[in-house]
């Protein structure tokens, strides 16, 4: 009887692990607005304070994240805002005040598709902002090589390996806007976890179609920026 129970337990664990490993990728049912902003000279702090406040006409109040550049690309802030399952653009737009415009040197806007808000919020640590306050985020954009979009998507969407320190991640395909195909945001619980993950990933540099090699097999361009979160 004990041996039968042990066998069933092992079988259950095997099925459970297989189910996790073969879990489908996040369903991309919703639209998000991605805003990269470079502060005007001497206005870095003020630009951050401005971007932390979601607009009064937000489609989904409270559904956003603001990340601040620490190392990487030229932009200073990235704002990712959830718009729901559909998004519209009016001719009048949402013009910023003259004071707000004076804070920005340049900005770039792109619409992407992504998971429903609860999935996105969980991956980014927004379902418990106090607990995730020390998180580190790596924001990356990729331009797929011609005919390699699906392969790049698959490579970027691979589940973290055993012992990986990634706390959450999303891969969001371009819908309209910037000259890239995918945006990925990867979250680590701390700077220590980020450093540990970076060190461990070196051993997987030449892993077939994953990490370092996968990007170079399927993308013609990419950049990575390390950030921290300033809102919410």
Model region roles, listed by residue range:
Residues 21-232:
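Short S/T/G/P-rich N-terminal loop/turn motif that feeds into the first structured element of a domain
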Residues 1-2:
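N-terminal secretory signal peptides that target proteins for export/translocation
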Residues 6-18:
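Bacterial N-terminal signal peptides
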């Amino acid at each position: 009887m004990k041996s039968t129970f042990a066998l069933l337990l092992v079988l259950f664990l095997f099925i459970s692990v297989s189910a996790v490993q073969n879990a489908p990728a996040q369903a991309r049912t919703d639209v998000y607005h991605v805003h990269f902003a470079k502060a005007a000279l001497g206005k870095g702090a003020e630009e951050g304070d401005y971007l932390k406040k979601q607009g009064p006409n937000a489609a989904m109040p409270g559904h956003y994240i603001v990340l601040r550049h620490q190392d990487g690309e030229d932009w200073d802030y990235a704002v990712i805002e959830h718009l729901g399952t559909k998004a519209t653009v009016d001719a009048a737009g949402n013009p910023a005040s003259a004071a707000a415009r004076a804070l920005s040197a340049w900005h770039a806007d792109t619409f992407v598709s992504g998971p429903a808000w609860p999935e996105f919020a969980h991956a980014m640590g927004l379902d418990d902002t106090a607990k995730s306050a020390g998180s580190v985020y790596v924001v990356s954009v990729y331009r797929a090589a011609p005919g390699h979009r699906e392969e790049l998507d698959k490579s970027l969407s691979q589940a973290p390996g055993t012992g990986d320190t990634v706390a959450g991640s999303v891969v969001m395909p371009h819908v309209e806007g910037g000259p890239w195909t995918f945006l990925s945001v990867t979250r680590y619980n701390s700077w220590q976890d980020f450093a540990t993950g970076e060190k461990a990933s070196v051993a997987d540099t030449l892993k077939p179609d994953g990490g370092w090699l996968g990007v170079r097999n399927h993308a013609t361009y990419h950049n990575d920026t390390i950030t921290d979160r300033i809102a919410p």
